[in-house]
Design a protein with these regions (language model features):
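N-terminal helix-rich structural modules
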Residues: 2-192, 197-198
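Short His/Asp/Glu-rich catalytic/ion-coordination signatures at enzyme active sites or charged loops
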Residues: 6-21, 71-90, 113-155, 213-255, ...
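Short, well-ordered loop/turn and helix-capping segments at boundaries between secondary-structure elements
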Residues: 31, 241, 467, 471-474
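Active-site-proximal, well-structured secondary-structure segments within enzyme catalytic domains
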Residues: 126, 130, 159-162, 169-213, ...
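Alpha-helix N-cap/helix-initiation motif
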Residues: 249, 253, 352, 356, ...
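Active-site-proximal segment of zinc-dependent metalloprotease catalytic domains
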Residues: 429-441, 446-459
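Active-site recognition of the HExxH zinc-binding catalytic motif
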Residues: 456-471
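Conserved small/polar residues in nucleotide/adenosyl-binding loops
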Residues: 475-480
Length: 481
């Protein structure tokens, strides 16, 4: 491989960092925050002193979110018993601290006084909007609550963070608990690349034969190509009942979801909202619950006609194979066949046009054409050999960095997401440049061939990169708070 220049931005030392160190850093950051809150007994007198309090809050938040960001990232992409234990053990303290911060009366009043002052209009627009958002967040975290209600909010908040973590762990564990060895006859219809992938999954589980897992690349391959209808049904049922009352009771999310729903409702009512949906929209663009509801209904009505037509086509095609009742585990398989018949176009035939290295090159050159930003791969410590680090440069000036971790593997949560590691903000040592993680679950490379992406995966990559770019290009100086 070509040698890369070292990262120019300060990046986390994933090759050296231990869970014990991370835990200590997080505990120390929480400690510093709590000390700061204890000392802030009243609103400072001058606007200078008030703005200085706001700046200190941003720095404390920056410290904590940086070390917590590394831990929660590892918990999502390299999940194992040790990481999970440290993560779980810190949740109560973290939740307690954020509740304390969000309900701190003197701090809230400091923000309020800055907003009410004559000096407010002269602040940079980004800072004004950050202050308005902070005031909104205080209200949403119960700053106005008193006595029992205040205590109850803190309990609910802590419990919800625990339940949300349990929920994710159950899904991950249930996904990984499933493995079905496949006989040759069951591979009928699968293209060579999918068979090689299932072979690789089998080897990883210590088997001498291909195996189906519930990882999305394996699941999609079988639902799209496997001629064996019984196999498709078995995988469909296993996949859709993960972490449910129909699976292993150890991973059952039913009680978790019931408790989350009832606590969310209680929390919303404590804060004066009629429902959790209403509470949730208080920090979103949509004006109210009815608007969102109507939007979804309109969307469904527009989609209904074409959907009915497509289902009719699939039913007709399945009937040719003697299938009288089209089931959910048949739609992926017959959709692919229909595309082949109508357009002579298969996902598989497109794949050679989308090798991952070429797609990244294409993505980066589009960004360069549209925004005049160059993307350069740099050497940086990573959590897994698949992960890579890049920096964005504009006329020789580094704007920020990002990591790509694109392929599905065991110990990694499903889906695709972007999470910030460090935000752009002015600190004591000058301007801090932003860095984020972009994570996907694409079909991994098999053997020493480059990974070949499906058209859907290419779409996802461009979508996630859009989030990342928006995050990196934003010029606001202050952090999220």
């Amino acid at each position: 491989a070509m040698t890369l220049e070292k990262a120019t931005l300060p990046v986390p030392q994933f090759d050296q960092i231990t869970l014990d160190q991370l835990k200590a850093q997080i505990e120390q950051a929480i400690q510093q925050g709590q000390t700061f809150l204890k000392q802030l007994a009243a609103v400072p007198d001058t606007i200078q002193a008030q703005l200085s309090v706001l700046a200190q809050v941003d720095l404390l938040e920056n410290n904590l979110s940086e070390s917590w960001g590394v831990l929660s990232h590892l918990n999502a992409v390299m999940n194992n018993a040790e990481t999970r234990e440290v993560y779980q053990s810190l949740l109560p303290a973290l939740s307690e601290y954020y509740t304390e911060l969000g309900q701190h009366t003197a701090l809230y009043q400091t923000y309020q006084q800055v907003q009410d002052s004559d000096a407010f209009a002269a602040l940079p627009a980004a800072q004004q909007s950050a202050i308005k958002l902070a005031l909104r967040d205080f209200k949403l975290s119960g700053v106005a609550l008193e006595g029992e209600a205040k205590k109850r909010y803190a309990e609910i908040s802590a419990r919800l963070s625990q339940l949300s973590s349990d929920f994710s762990n159950h899904v991950l564990d249930a996904t990984q608990a499933y493995c079905k060895p496949l006989a040759d006859a069951q591979l009928k219809g699968l293209p060579q690349s999918s068979i090689a992938l299932l072979q690789q999954y089998g080897q990883q589980r210590g088997l001498q034969q291909p195996a189906a897992t519930l990882d999305i690349p394996s699941y999609m391959a079988i639902m799209t190509y496997a001629a064996d209808r019984g196999l498709r049904e078995e995988l469909y049922r296993a996949y859709t009942t993960r972490a449910s009352e129909q699976g292993n009771p150890e991973f059952d999310n039913t009680p978790v979801m019931e408790e989350i729903l009832s606590l969310r409702q209680e929390m919303a009512q404590l804060l004066g909202f009629s429902s959790y949906a209403e509470f949730s929209l208080a920090s979103k663009m949509a004006p109210d619950v009815a608007t969102v509801h109507q939007f979804l209904i309109d969307l469904a009505e527009h989609a209904r006609k074409p959907a009915e037509q497509e289902i009719a086509e699939l039913k007709a095609m399945a009937a040719e194979d003697g299938i009288a009742d089209l089931q959910p585990w048949d739609t992926g398989y017959y959709s692919e066949k229909l595309k082949m018949r109508q357009f002579n176009l298969s996902q598989e035939a497109l794949k050679p046009y989308f090798p991952a290295p070429k797609i990244l090159q294409g993505l980066f050159s589009i960004v360069s054409r549209l925004y005049g930003i160059n993307i350069v791969e740099r050497e940086a410590p990573v959590w897994h050999p698949d992960a890579r680090y890049f920096e964005l440069e504009e006329q020789g000036n580094v704007l920020g960095g990002f990591y790509f971790d694109l392929y599905a593997r065991s110990g990694k949560r499903g889906g695709a997401w972007m999470s910030g590691f460090r935000s752009r903000m002015q600190t004591g040592n000058g301007l801090q440049k932003p860095i984020c993680y972009m994570v996907c679950n694409f079909t991994p490379p098999v053997g020493d061939q480059p990974a070949l992406l499906t058209h859907d995966e290419v779409n996802t990559l461009f979508h996630e990169f859009g989030h990342g770019l928006q995050d990196r290009k934003s010029t606001r100086l202050n952090s999220s708070h």
